[in-house]
């Protein structure tokens, strides 16, 4: 999965995070480096909580941008138990201290997403459900790619990365355009036949209207799952896929 991440994008994340944390000066790091006389030191990355390791490329990008090197002992996707030695980071003291917090913030958050994704996928599979657990666009602003990467490492799907790779008509879109059919006609005129269109539905009637109007995907939003899903699948027919959204 690491090959999915373009190197220029990783470098941009690293630069932004480092600039956010140390926009001008790192006085404490500078003082520590003076005491150390600029010599090379070694830091050890430890896993202190059980979970899925994820975010290695982002961690490494931050370290490299700060002038450090990383030697990994475990890879993204592995389940780690505490206390596990994950990696060794080498560099000057001030470089290690500069990279430490942004690199750890990214790694811990992405690993948390991956861990929850794996647990949710495991629970869904245990019920015999054949579908795929996916994450939505409800991501942290500016952190979507890392969080989507965490979902993939954890074994979940990403649903969509933004508004351009899948057209999704939510209730406000449908309301603004006067109805499900009108909304579908409107987006089809712009998207053509190359992009799939998903319609968010809050009732059985809306779901059937969306399927009849040509929606590729019908999303049931916060509906009672058991009987509603079965009934919708039976009535909807084979031409549209079904997704389920829940808080």
Report the location of each language-model feature.
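Conserved phosphotransfer cores of two-component systems
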Residues: 239
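Acidic/glycine-rich phosphate/pyrophosphate-binding loops and surrounding catalytic core
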Residues: 1-209, 213, 217, 230, ...
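Short secondary-structure boundary segments
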Residues: 222
């Amino acid at each position: 999965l690491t090959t999915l991440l373009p190197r220029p994008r990783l470098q941009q994340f690293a630069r932004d995070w480092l600039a956010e944390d140390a926009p001008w000066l790192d006085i404490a790091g500078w003082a520590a480096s003076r005491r150390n006389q600029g010599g090379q030191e070694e830091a050890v990355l430890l896993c202190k909580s059980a979970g899925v390791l994820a975010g290695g490329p982002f961690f490494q990008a931050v370290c490299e941008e700060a002038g450090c090197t990383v030697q990994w002992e475990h890879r993204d996707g592995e389940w780690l138990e505490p206390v596990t030695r994950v990696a060794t980071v080498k560099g000057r003291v001030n470089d290690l201290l500069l990279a430490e917090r942004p690199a750890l913030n990214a790694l811990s958050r992405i690993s948390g997403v991956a861990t929850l994704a794996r647990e949710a996928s495991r629970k869904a599979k245990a019920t015999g459900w054949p579908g795929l657990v996916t994450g939505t666009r409800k991501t942290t602003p500016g952190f979507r790619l890392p969080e989507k990467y965490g979902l993939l490492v954890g074994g979940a799907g990403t649903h969509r990365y933004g508004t351009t790779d899948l057209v999704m008509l939510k209730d406000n879109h449908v309301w603004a355009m006067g109805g499900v059919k009108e909304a579908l006609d409107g987006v089809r005129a712009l998207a053509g036949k190359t992009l799939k269109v998903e319609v968010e539905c809050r009732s059985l009637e809306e779901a059937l209207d969306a399927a009849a109007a040509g929606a590729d995907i019908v999303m049931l939003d916060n509906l009672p799952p058991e009987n509603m899903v079965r009934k919708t699948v039976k009535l909807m027919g084979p031409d549209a896929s079904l997704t389920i959204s829940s808080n």
